[in-house]
Every structure is written in C-alpha cells, then in structure tokens.
C-alpha cells in the first residue's frame, strides 16, 4: 500500500487555447476589448505560456495588436 506521506506530485492540467473550438472568438484588430485581455498593465503583449494561446494564434494575436496600435485603437505604452 502507498504510504500516507508519499503522494504523487500535483499535476497541473494544460489549459486549452481560447481561440480554438466551436464558438471561439475571431481575432480581429478592430476588437480592442478582446485584445486588451492579452496586453499587460504596462502595454506589452502577454506571452502564450501565460495565456495558453497556441503558437499560430499567438502570432495572429500579436499581428492584430500591432495593427491596432498603429491605427491608434490601442496604446503602445500604458502609464
């Protein structure tokens, strides 16, 4: 029998990408409300290891954020 003190280590389940699936939101540079969720409080794009966005969708997301910044929909820096 297993010892009460020797337990298996906690296994954290990998989060799935929020942009894949049936009713997932479409990444669009005009949707500033959605893009703001993936920008830090300093205005930087949050990495995919934190947001669990897939590599392909992270590239799409970064492109959309950069377009929105260029058009003035999102700020480059938040003070």
From Swiss-Prot:
Gene Ontology BP terms: translation
One Gene Ontology molecular-function label: structural constituent of ribosome
Cellular component terms per the entry's GO annotation: cytosolic small ribosomal subunit
Superkingdom of origin organism: Bacteria
Keywords: Ribonucleoprotein, Ribosomal protein, RNA-binding, rRNA-binding
Family: Belongs to the bacterial ribosomal protein bS18 family.
Alphabetical list of PANTHER family matching this protein: 30S RIBOSOMAL PROTEIN S18, SMALL RIBOSOMAL SUBUNIT PROTEIN BS18M
Subunit architecture: Part of the 30S ribosomal subunit. Forms a tight heterodimer with protein bS6.
Function: Binds as a heterodimer with protein bS6 to the central domain of the 16S rRNA, where it helps stabilize the platform of the 30S subunit.
Name of this protein: Small ribosomal subunit protein bS18
